[in-house]
């Protein structure tokens, strides 16, 4: 898993540096934060696909048994993405970086100017709660119904991430 993450991020960085025109090339830190986000999104997509794929073919059963590890790895990558975003885009001002992230763009009434960062933060909070409660101990403490409801919120988080990526891409093309 670790090797796969390293290869994915390395390939993303290499492709980003080699294939983009020099006039519009992103900085290496921007490529790194995008690579961490893209790798996290790919892992989450894989995690969501593993259940149905394991029913179709026994080849996917090893991934099903290791899904918890995939989820924790994906949340760590998403946290790294968020930390790099805060450091690069909001870490060099007098304002607290978290306040800057959430308050710098209040245009919630416009699709073109919507602060897509808030969608990513909301998804990250849900996914962090899921990762923190993924151990069987929390299933006992929370009860099966509450634990299941919390972990079914992954689909809402996935929708938030898709909206975060789409709005970020659209707004980044300006």
PLM segments and residue spans:
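Membrane-embedded alpha-helical bundles that constitute the cytochrome b-like, heme-associated redox core
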Residues: 1-174
């Amino acid at each position: 898993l670790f090797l796969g993450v390293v290869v994915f991020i390395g390939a993303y960085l290499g492709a980003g540096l080699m294939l983009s025109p020099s006039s519009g090339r992103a900085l290496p830190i921007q490529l790194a934060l995008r690579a961490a986000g893209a790798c996290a999104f790919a892992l989450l997509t894989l995690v969501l696909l593993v259940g149905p794929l394991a029913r179709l073919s026994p080849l996917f059963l090893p991934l099903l048994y290791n899904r918890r590890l995939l989820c924790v790895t994906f949340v760590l990558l998403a946290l790294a993405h968020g930390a790099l975003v805060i450091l690069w885009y909001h870490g060099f001002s007098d304002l607290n970086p978290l306040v800057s992230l959430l308050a710098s763009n209040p245009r919630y009434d416009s699709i073109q100017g919507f602060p897509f960062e808030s969608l990513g933060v909301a998804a990250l909070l849900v996914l962090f709660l899921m990762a923190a409660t993924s151990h069987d101990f929390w299933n006992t403490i929370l009860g099966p119904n509450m634990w299941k409801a919390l972990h079914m919120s992954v689909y809402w988080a996935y929708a938030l991430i898709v909206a975060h990526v789409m709005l970020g891409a659209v707004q980044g093309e300006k």
